[in-house]
Amino acid sequence: MSRSPLNLSRRTMMAALGLGAGAAGLAACGAPNGGGGGSADGSVRDGFSQADLTVPSEYEGRTPILFWAPFTGVNYEVLAEQFAAFNESQDEIVAIAESVGGYADLNQKFTAALQARTVPDIVCFPEMQWLQFYNSDALAPLDSYFDDEWNLDVYIDNYVAEGKAAGETFVVPFARSTPLFYYNKTRYIEAGLPEEGPETWEDLAEFAPELAKIEVEGRPLAALAVGADDAWHAQADIWGFGGANANEDFAVTINEDAGVEWLEWQRKFIHEDKFGYMAQAAGTDFASGITAGMRGSTAGLTGTTAATEGVFEVGTAFMLSKEGQEKQVPTGGSGLSIVRSDSQDRHDACAELFRFLAQPEKSAEWHAGTGYVPIVKAAADTQTVKDLVAENPNYGVALAQLENARTADYTNWDQGSVTEIGAAQAQVYGDGADPKKVLDALAATLQETLDDNREDYEAVEFEGWN
């Protein structure tokens, strides 16, 4: 199995950026923690200028800050609304958001930008994948900006540790999520199944034959569509079978008995029982009614609800587990980071934007517009969130599942390994390959990567294992 070019260790990244060995010690460090309005003196990085952007004429003369946003569609539209509100709330800063596609697109674009030394002011990487850029000294610490009104205590606890390294904060939570099990409630009711959906994989296996009695476009209705890039969902799956991708001692365990059992269950369900299949776009198939189930992000809840309005009722449930096993889901989504550049004024302006977005009502609006978790604790008490849950209980399911959220295993801390996991799953989901052989080959690749990154990960002094 080939190693992905996105899988960059600190040494690889430093070499790619043309930085000598002496640069490895130049960790981004800020001033001692101070009050609000402070600045992270020492995080300025000469020679790294701002990437091109266009400032609307009505905002000329303000300090411009550029966010390369890994969002498209509805989520990007809601982000643009939040940025517009920030720009109207004051007269010194203009925040510009530019959609760059998804997380993998951002990873590639930002890596190239660092090499060219023309960078955005804000980036937003998923889970722990920001570490490769922290390790190349590309991100500025945030702690000196915190005060009594804006600090890490305002955010949901499960997500805070993922933004810290070696005692400093480099990411504040923003577009955070968990995976959910989505199902076609209308079809479940038609099939005489519990309208609250399945709780376990055994439930889904029991429900699938009843769903298959319903024909859609001349074919039996599938119980589940999976994607070729299901590595995030698979983290919940393997935990739900009592296994793990890796342990806290940096040993890859994805090919142990629990992992093989999980992937063999999926192989049989798809290729022998014919109750599921690998889709090019599971979300599209779900919205069109071809499949009665899929796994998706809470961040897709608003869009999925809109896409199926008037067609069928969407139901959501916690991610499935094997009967008798603990339900756990990986934290997902991303947080906001300031990119080290040649302007302290822009760094400070970014922090003001982060402070604005951490207001409870703004967090609630982001949640309502997208489905991302209302990451600010106080947002749950806003009328916006209360009304939303009352109108659509699926949002309440997403909130209730947060107690099961935990940080993904080390294997999921970099984009390259995530890509490798997805490719391995696709061999089983799509081709019916032998799970044990696939996982053994995958484990060897993942272990090589983890060994390469271990020193960097240990230096993080991660505080979030639970």
Language-model-detected regions and their locations in the chain:
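N-terminal secretory signal peptides
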Residues: 1-8, 15-24, 274
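Extracytoplasmic/periplasmic substrate-recognition and gating elements
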Residues: 61, 88-89, 189-191, 264-277, ...
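Short, well-ordered beta-strand elements
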Residues: 61-72, 93-98, 122
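Extracytoplasmic "Venus flytrap"/periplasmic binding protein-like
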Residues: 82-155, 190-192, 292-293, 307-309, ...
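Long, aromatic- and glycine/proline-rich binding clefts that accommodate carbohydrate-like moieties
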Residues: 91, 158-160, 317, 368-427, ...
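Extracytoplasmic/periplasmic solute-binding protein
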Residues: 166-174, 179, 202-251, 258, ...
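Glycine-centered hinge/linker elements that transmit conformational signals in sensory
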Residues: 207-210, 248-277, 319
